[in-house]
Amino acid sequence: MTDTNHSSMRQHSLQSLAIAAIGVVFGDIGTSPLYSLKEAFSPAHGIPLTPSAILGVISLLFWAIILVVGIKYVLFVMRADNNGEGGVLALMALSLRPLNPKSRITGLMMALGIFGACMFYGDAVITPAISVMSAVEGLEVATPQLSHLVLPITIVILIALFWIQRHGTATVGKLFGPIMVLWFVTIAALGIYHIARAPMIVSAINPYYAFSFMSEHVLLAYVVLGSVVLVLTGAEALYADMGHFGAKPIRLAAYVLVMPSLVLNYFGQGALLLLDPKAIENPFFLLAPQWAALPLVVLSTVATVIASQAVISGAYSLTSQAIQLGYVPRMKILHTSELAIGQIYVPVVNWLLLFVILCIVIGFKSSDNLAAAYGIAVTATMVITTILAAVVMVKVWNWNKLLVAMIIGVFLVIDLGFFGANLLKVEQGGWLPLGIGALLFFLLMTWYKGRHIVKERTAADGIPLAPFLQGLLAHPPHRVSGTAIYLTGNDTLVPVSLLHNLKHNKVLHERTIFMTFVTRDIPYVKDHERVTVHDAGEGLYIVKAEYGFNETPDVKAVLEEVARQRGMTFELMDTSFFLARETVVPTHLPGMSIWRERVFAWMHQNAAKPTDFFAIPANRVVELGTKIEI
């Protein structure tokens, strides 16, 4: 094949990935024109709809997109990939790699990363609510007589969206890219039409209007910043979804279609307001002629459902990562596609999200009321991403500290400005994502610390495996036919389940495997590096299986690899899996306060069973109980 053909294929692949990325990565930020400008000129802010104010706000929107999306995320943050993977937990894992595990900075970076992940969930319950609701509210413009149906229709759409999750979205997901391309082309065309009617709006490109607006209104302008940040909702997805599509396709989509379309639409809305300030009641839908209003409502609703789907899938992926990294208890994870590795479904997360989202929709009743709650989760995550990226630049990339200080300083001023402006909205609704984030942060930190204490207690009371096996082989118990697999969290200690089996049954299987799963701080582990097998003699094997934080442990696949390496065969129905069922008992021992220990014990009790998590046949499992005092 010629170099020209290779180049053509690469180009085609890049374009295909870019279109696919548009359907997943840019749904959230792509639907922000539905409510952003309307919220900026909310009557509660008291900003007059004068030409200078309109130009000033549009200028702020424009430069926010350029600086935060176009420069910070696309040019800088997306460079900080963890073996190709992005997202706040991947960035945290990367930033922790060169640090001393016992240093304070390590604890701070870990806490920041976990809090950033928790704030994502705060964002994940608001995005579907505000996006779908704002789209359906277009009925108030298209067919005012149906305005009383906005809330019921929103609820029905959201319930249907979460109901279909268990069946997977791989089939309809192929349509997401083309539909979102149509969406961006449509909003760009609507913007261009009105820009042509009021070309004066183009002067908002000049940052003078942004600075003039800020200096003229000062305090009010700072409040407006809390609404301006709504144009950036979903910017974090550019980085978080990098592992699915790669940096190049996302950059191509951002610069060629997404950012130009967003800018054109915001400028079009600004032009409409210059022509008719009364259009502020719903500037997005009033961009369309009356005959196109209803089709635009339908397209908007589909686009917001796609945006919501991206957030929901992101919540599943983040939960899976957090489980593998040890910050969240085991949960049942179902794979909804045999072909697409990343297509997963987490039932607990799905139904909790739906419950909270429905409560939000019913409680807030309109997208206007909900807008105040939106920005704070986004800006908090932006600040955390900037700080973690700074650590990576200095510690991992070894960049000049002065250069990093200059770059990060500019980004932090912008991020903290937006975050501070959103703190003013805590009383109006900002308490919601903050409360969700704080509660989840407490639970995740409690789980992480509790597991650390359990490991310490287990290690202190544990028996080293190597000398134990030597003694066992010197004075072997009665051997029985078949294979026994002992799942253990520490490959240097004797599994408690083995001690119980020897104590009560006084037998050892002719083939005994001690299997440990280890999660590394990279997203994926190469197949040839995954499984190591140590032959301890006389049919005893120590197996260590390493997985990345984006992977799900697979007992069956590990056994197949062990069989390949050692020339064995395994019959699942002739194999027994021995597990230790730990019962955590809160005490007044040093570690955590007794009430946190009780919370941890409750989480531990309600974690998914290892049989469900590791997909082990339940009828082949022997569980032996053990108590651990913490």
Curated annotation (Swiss-Prot):
Annotated localization: Cell inner membrane
Superkingdom in the source lineage: Bacteria
Database matches in Pfam families: K_trans (PF02705), K_trans_C (PF22776)
Parts of the chain that traverse the membrane: 17-37, 51-71, 105-125, 144-164, 175-195, 218-238, 255-275, 283-303, 344-364, 374-394, 402-422, 428-448
Keyword terms of this UniProt record: Cell inner membrane, Cell membrane, Ion transport, Membrane, Potassium, Potassium transport, Symport, Transmembrane, Transmembrane helix, Transport
Family recorded in the similarity comment: Belongs to the HAK/KUP transporter (TC 2.A.72) family.
Protein name, as recorded: Probable potassium transport system protein Kup
Native source species: Burkholderia pseudomallei (strain 668)
